[in-house]
Amino acid sequence: MIHITLPDGSQREFAGPVTVAEVAASIGSGLAKAALAGKIGDKVVDTSYQITQDSPLSIVTAKDADGLEVIRHSTAHLLAYAVKELFPDAQVTIGPVIENGFYYDFSYKRPFTPEDLAAIEKRMAELAAKDEPVVRRVLPRDEAVAYFKGLGEHYKAEIIASIPTNEDVSLYREGGFEDLCRGPHVPSTGKLKFFKLMKVAGAYWRGDHRNEMLQRIYGTAWATKEELQEYLHMLEEAEKRDHRKLGRELDLFHIDEHSPGTVFWHPKGWTLWQEVEQYMRRVYRDNGYQEVKGPQILDKTLWEKTGHWDKYRDNMFTTESEKRDYALKPMNCPGHILIFKQGIKSYRDLPLRYGEFGQCHRNEPTGGLHGIMRVRGFTQDDGHIFCTEDHILAECTAYTALLQKVYKDFGFHNIIYKVATRPEARIGSDESWDKAEHALMESLRASGCEFEIAPGDGAFYGPKIEYTLKDAIGRQWQCGTMQVDFSMPERLDAEYVGEDGGRHRPVMLHRAIVGSLERFIGILIEEHAGALPVWLAPVQVAVLNITDAQQDYCREIAAKLQKALPNQGLRVVTDLRNEKITYKIREHSLQKLPYILVAGDKEKAAGAVAVRARGNKDLGVMSLDAFVDLIAQDIASKV
């Protein structure tokens, strides 16, 4: 007898080997129809998988995350099936699942057109409607190589040839198409109903620019029509909010071909940058951080000690001078340890907090660059806390509360918390890891945060908390980090004198709240769709005249506004052009300014202004003092 244990703890008995589909059918016809796969322990398997011994089993449906993964994986194969039907000369390569969808790479004699994409999607729907069974078979490696060579699928043959000789490989067939795959897959193509092809892009075979350029077709697939529509709507919103588009329209920045992956900030964009940086500088100052500044170029011997030269060199920009090798720093932490090591440190000096707006460089591949979100040169709000193990809990608790306030001030209220715990390969004692992991989790509990645990996802040198923002359209951005590090102080020989008079290693806490300032500003632009809160807006007020008779009055208003707030002048522009007032209002509205002040003869005579708020809201005529009170309140409340 074979005993199958279901998720609710109940058991079912079977006389002999039984498939996942048969177990589902024994539970109910509805579940049998909905079943996409099965999960035995942590392994997801086909519904045709035969269970030969007592096992725990859950039936995977479209409602499960694993079910969505199977749908997307199978839809990638459906895409390849449709392409081969329409373009028999195309060669298939690989087609993995990615975030929110999938892609498949093809080799073909000409580029696929938008019309081709529409035809492929239509053919996919037709093939899905046939509800053809998806059938798995296993071949010895060499036989599989010969099989795909015989089909003219040389890329597939190359992939299989790289597999060890003694391994078998699995193939999946649907209708007239068969593909190499580990699986699992849906039981039939009829399970694939809600998908859309998104775009075609270029991709090098095996990611190597020396190889042939392939065509990558991207698609998305979902469990329900509603989820697909929600996702497509989110993409439409994301396109409207695209920071690259808004950066051009609002004249904030540009990326230039002469320096790919680095940002040219225009005056308005640099004003925004300065506001973010000065805010974070106040955060440093008000929370016990000492701001420091380290060099950007450091000798390779330092990077050898930290392990970066061995493990990370391909991502570093290197140079040579006077027969010495140097690298542009990809991170700030080694420099902070060098500062810590200057002079003798006592246990009384701990915790010692350093903060730096450190410019870093990483040699990201060109294909991975994305506006100001993914760049090669970036600045971090990088902080490092040198402390003892006993300090970790208090430091992490204070940091989480601080991070929550910062995110709230920038308009983010939905934060996801994750604790990444010890991997199998690690340094440090189990006792130290126990203490550090407990401190991280307790710090989140003390801050009232619900969190998930990511077992084994910590770095080899310590556990960490990841803080992820959820934006206005549901996208997630991992920005903040609190990383415990037992390793780098050891590697770079950092010490302090303990209460016992002996030498001890400090624990190092790496922390960043916004992370890359470039990326965070990109997130801010997209979160607010370019309509930045008043306190961040590069231009807060535009003063417009109706006729030339109000020019001097408008200049006077602007001058008063620029001096209106103590320690903070308002950012004001005047528009005195001889243009229709409706034209000028529209132009400044498109720049998403928080306020537009209009002055005609009546306003000039009354010593007042007509106020228009963003969103075409007419607030009527008010005195300049009343307007200053209004905008001061906006700035103070960070709206």
Swiss-Prot record:
Where do the annotations place Zn(2+) binding? C333, H384, H510
Q: Which GO terms describe its biological process?
A: threonyl-tRNA aminoacylation
Q: Which PROSITE patterns match?
A: AA_TRNA_LIGASE_II, TGS
- Any idea which UniProt keywords this protein has? Aminoacyl-tRNA synthetase, ATP-binding, Cytoplasm, Ligase, Metal-binding, Nucleotide-binding, Protein biosynthesis, RNA-binding, tRNA-binding, Zinc
EC main group:
ligase
Q: How does it assemble?
A: Homodimer.
- State its role: Catalyzes the attachment of threonine to tRNA(Thr) in a two-step reaction: L-threonine is first activated by ATP to form Thr-AMP and then transferred to the acceptor end of tRNA(Thr). Also edits incorrectly charged L-seryl-tRNA(Thr).
Name by which UniProt lists this protein:
Threonine--tRNA ligase
Q: Which organism is it from?
A: Acidovorax sp. (strain JS42)
* Recorded name of the encoding gene: thrS
